[in-house]
């Protein structure tokens, strides 16, 4: 993004879409606690803030003095900024009383029941409604800046993965490989890992979330590597499974079953299909090959400012309809207890009938190191 004016234009478009949803809820304002959501609407990346957005598009950002200069540099456009000097709920209540609002939506997932009751007691003349996933609904459809930033996060992650492969050898620990990968994210221009890097070798490959441990990698093992770097707030999420030397025939067999299942899932990732359509395209193939019981998780999820976003084909029953410029993962897997596992995951952009794989890393042949 080349200028503050271009950024402001994008932010105003996001605000307009969000205020439309506020009005559809017949509300006057939305109180936002989720860091990803207030960043989406302000460009402020600090971790301590709350945002009030009115149906008219007015914004009130509440933070503290530590972030005063950062807010000034990061947030273009008109916005009231309040440096908190008291309890956050009291501060929010005070600002709401100054606005011409009656019905207020509150992000229910990010406020405790005690805080919600305190807010209602502080503003007895206002009507509060717990609301979930309103800004997330807007975030589902990525704009130009988001796609550019997301692609950069993916490219950094992919390059870092390529650079750790020569380090994988018998006797090296999973933890050492994971630490090096996390280091490379930053050296290649990223902001560090967006989740705890998974390096799961041998029997630990059957653990869907086998984060890097002290286990030493041995010859004849599969290694599941699930990784992603942040870049300017956006995250990649990629998985590759590699082999250290030759592995037993069934482990090699399930690699190619998972690969075909993923290809079928990606092919189904088109506008108009549901999450269930994508999940079933991959899951049914794994079932046909006799491994259905060893694929226990959903086939994917949305990605963006968070590694798991609202747009999610994750569950076999998901009815969410895919739309252009949604970014999702497609990640089938087979996990054989005490023997090993395979997962292959790519980041995919919904583009009409032509899903675009954003994470360009080889996978058509099992990589043997």
Tell me the role of every PLM-derived stretch.
Residues 1-369:
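Active-site neighborhoods and metal-handling regions in enzymes and metal-associated proteins
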């Amino acid at each position: 993004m080349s200028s503050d004016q271009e950024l402001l234009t994008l932010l105003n478009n996001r605000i307009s879409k969000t205020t439309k949803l506020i009005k559809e809820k017949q509300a006057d304002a939305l109180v936002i606690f989720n860091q990803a959501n207030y960043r989406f609407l302000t460009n402020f990346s600090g971790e301590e803030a709350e945002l009030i957005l009115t149906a008219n598009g007015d914004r009130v950002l509440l933070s503290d003095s530590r972030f005063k200069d950062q807010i000034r540099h990061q947030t273009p456009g008109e916005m009231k900024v309040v440096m908190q000097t008291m309890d956050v709920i009291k501060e929010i209540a005070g600002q709401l009383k100054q606005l011409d609002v009656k019905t207020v939506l509150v992000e229910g997932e990010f406020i405790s029941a005690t805080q919600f009751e305190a807010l209602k007691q502080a503003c007895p003349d206002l009507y509060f409604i717990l609301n979930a996933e309103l800004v997330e609904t807007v975030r589902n459809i990525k704009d130009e800046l988001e796609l550019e930033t997301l692609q950069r996060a993916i490219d950094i992650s992919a390059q870092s993965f390529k650079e750790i492969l020569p380090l994988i050898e018998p006797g090296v620990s999973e933890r050492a490989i994971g630490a090096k990968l996390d280091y490379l994210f930053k050296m290649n221009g990223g902001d560090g890992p967006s989740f705890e890097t998974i390096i799961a070798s041998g029997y630990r490959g059957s653990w869907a979330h086998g984060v890097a441990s002290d286990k030493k990698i041995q010859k004849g093992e599969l290694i599941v590597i699930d990784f992603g770097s942040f870049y300017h707030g956006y995250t990649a999420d990629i998985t590759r499974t590699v082999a250290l030397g030759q592995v037993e025939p069934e482990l090699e067999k399930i690699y190619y079953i998972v690969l075909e299942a993923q290809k079928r899932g990606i092919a189904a990732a088109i506008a108009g299909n549901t999450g269930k359509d994508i999940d079933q395209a991959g899951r049914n193939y794994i079932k046909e090959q006799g491994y259905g019981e060893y694929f226990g998780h959903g086939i994917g999820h949305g990605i963006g400012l968070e590694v798991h976003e609202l747009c999610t084909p994750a569950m076999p029953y998901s009815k969410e309809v895919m739309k252009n410029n949604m970014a999702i993962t497609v990640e089938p897997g087979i996990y054989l207890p005490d023997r090993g596992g395979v997962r292959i995951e790519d980041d995919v952009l919904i583009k009409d009938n032509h899903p675009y794989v954003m994470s360009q890393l080889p996978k058509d042949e099992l990589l043997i190191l």
